[in-house]
C-alpha cells in the first residue's frame, strides 16, 4: 500500500469488496512501540455493520482490523472474510 497521511483516512466511507457500506473512519488505533496500525475506528455505522461480530469501543464504535484493509482510494475497501 502507498503511504497516506492519517487525515486522508478520517471521514472516508468504509465498504466491503462486495460494496456493502460499514461506516465512516473516525480514528485509527496503533501500537505505540512499533507504530503498527491495529484498527480503524468506525462511526455512523450501518444496519449491516450491526449484524457483524466486530470488536467495539466503550462508545460502541466498530473496530475494523487494519489487516482487513484491501485498498484506500475514494473509499476504504475491506475484506469481509478478514473481519472475524
Question: Which residue stretches match the model-derived regions?
Answer:
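Peripheral interaction segments used for macromolecular assembly
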Residues: 1-84
Amino acid at each position: 500500500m502507498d503511504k497516506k497521511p492519517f487525515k486522508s483516512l478520517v471521514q472516508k466511507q468504509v465498504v466491503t469488496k462486495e460494496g456493502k457500506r460499514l461506516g465512516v473512519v473516525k480514528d485509527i488505533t496503533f501500537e505505540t512501540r512499533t507504530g503498527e496500525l491495529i484498527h480503524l475506528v468506525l462511526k455512523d455505522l450501518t444496519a449491516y455493520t450491526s449484524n457483524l461480530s466486530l470488536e467495539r469501543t466503550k462508545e460502541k464504535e466498530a473496530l475494523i482490523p487494519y489487516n482487513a484493509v484491501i485498498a484506500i482510494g475514494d473509499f476504504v475497501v475491506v475484506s469481509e472474510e478478514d473481519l472475524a
